[in-house]
């Protein structure tokens, strides 16, 4: 694999990672049914994947060129992707523990898992991720080694090094500290927790079949709780498959220095695989989780496809501005310089207000009637929701909301 092919694939992954994970965050923002503690951790994971596309992949491409830089500047580029990897691992671990509590001790879930605690845990995870990933910046690096053929090029000025990952980040840090302590151990812990989740669920289902007890959870309720655990277990498994190959190569490089170094094409492939994991999660949400899938469709139809059609139709430009009032939201449109509230033909625009916060524009005196659950638009329609929802203390996985959503299900 040539460097040009590697760079092209990395750029495609970056774009897909940004778009897909922005869609995840957007879905949680606009759909109150998705605003629960579990999905707060999902948003944290999506934020790390967005940062991979925005920062980590450009940094990796830059390092692959072997440019000349100050050692600590190169070190920051090399270590930042480790910060995001660590944040992803911590997010997956918190999601796993959240699901374990919901299934094993559901009656105590509301008291143990609250929004305030979830936000605090997310903040702690990000602080720890930066501390672990940027540890080489504090001295555990190769910058203090004498400059030789390994980490210095004659083409670089004095005080600069050829910026390559293995030349500035020591392999003992990558293997013992980063991989063994903070990648492998959390992955094994998640594996053990998911095994306990599925074994406990299987045992409870067998008890329900043999001797149903009054007051126990129904079979359908338990299955609704196990289904998201399966989806999240798939995400953890794919994360392990994507990140382990590169770490295994690092182990071979460290424990067998006399062995031949991995060929460039294999290094490129494992790096692409580790970054490609950032694209996978939104696809799993869309395929496995109904509420996410429906919200994705509404976003794409309402904010992408219909807007494109409006801009193409007749060359008429429309600018929409929303003014908030205590009773709800109002919409005023200006078409081709005409004042707000008046169409080009002189007829008045009469926006229909609804108590639930949704606003429906009237086009040419004709009402664009829609049901509450339909997010498709008529000729001109602005769909807005005043109330973004609050984080429910009880997970929607156990008690589905009245609107029929189910968080991560």
UniProtKB/Swiss-Prot annotation:
Disulfide bonds join 68-156, 71-143, 74-163, 256-259. The gene is ADORA2A. InterPro entries: Adeno_A2A_rcpt, Adenosn_rcpt, GPCR_Rhodpsn, GPCR_Rhodpsn_7TM. It comes from Cavia porcellus. The chain crosses the membrane at residues 5-29, 40-63, 75-97, 118-140, 171-195, 232-255, 264-287. Adenosine binds at residues 166, 250, 274-275. Residues 30-39, 98-117, 196-231, 288-409 are cytoplasmic. Belongs to the G-protein coupled receptor 1 family. This is Adenosine receptor A2a. CDD domains: 7tmA_Adenosine_R_A2A (cd15068). Residues 1-4, 64-74, 141-170, 256-263 are extracellular.
């Amino acid at each position: 694999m040539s460097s040009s092919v590697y760079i092209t694939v990395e750029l495609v992954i970056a774009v897909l990672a940004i778009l897909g994970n922005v869609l995840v965050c957007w879905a949680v923002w606009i759909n109150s049914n998705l605003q629960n503690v579990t999905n707060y951790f999902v948003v944290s994971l999506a934020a790390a994947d967005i940062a991979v596309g925005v920062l980590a992949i450009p940094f990796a491409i830059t390092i692959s060129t072997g440019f000349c830089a100050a050692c600590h500047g190169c070190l920051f580029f090399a270590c930042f992707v480790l910060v995001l990897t660590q944040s992803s691992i911590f997010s997956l671990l918190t999601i796993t523990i959240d699901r374990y509590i919901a299934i094993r001790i559901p009656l105590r879930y509301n008291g143990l898992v609250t929004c305030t605690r979830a936000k605090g845990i997310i903040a702690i995870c990000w602080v720890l991720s930066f501390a672990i990933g940027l540890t080489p910046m504090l001295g555990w690096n190769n910058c203090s080694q004498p400059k030789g053929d390994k980490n210095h090029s004659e083409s670089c000025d004095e005080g600069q090094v050829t910026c390559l990952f293995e030349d500035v980040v020591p392999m003992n840090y990558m293997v013992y500290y980063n991989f063994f302590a903070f990648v492998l151990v959390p992955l094994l812990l998640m594996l053990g927790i998911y095994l306990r989740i599925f074994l406990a669920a299987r045992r409870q289902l067998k008890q329900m079949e043999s001797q149903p007890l009054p007051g126990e959870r129904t079979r359908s309720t338990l299955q609704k709780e196990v289904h998201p655990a399966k989806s999240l277990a798939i995400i953890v498994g794919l994360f392990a498959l994507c990140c382990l190959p590169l770490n295994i190569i690092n182990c071979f490089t460290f424990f067998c220095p006399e062995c031949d170094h991995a060929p460039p094409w294999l290094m490129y492939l494992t790096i692409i695989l580790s970054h490609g994991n950032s694209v996978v999660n939104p696809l799993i949400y869309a395929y496995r989780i109904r509420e996410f899938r429906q919200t994705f469709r509404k976003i794409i139809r309402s904010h992408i496809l219909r807007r494109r059609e409006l801009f193409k139709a007749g060359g008429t430009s429309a600018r929409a501005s929303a003014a908030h009032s205590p009773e709800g939201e109002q919409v005023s449109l200006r078409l081709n310089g005409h004042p707000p509230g008046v169409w080009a033909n002189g007829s008045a625009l009469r926006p229909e207000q609804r108590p639930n916060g949704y606003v429906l524009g009237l086009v040419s005196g004709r009402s664009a009637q829609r049901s509450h659950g339909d997010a498709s638009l008529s000729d001109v329609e602005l769909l807005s929701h005043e109330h973004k929802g609050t984080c429910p203390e009880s997970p929607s996985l156990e008690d589905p909301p009245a609107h029929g959503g189910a968080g991560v299900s």
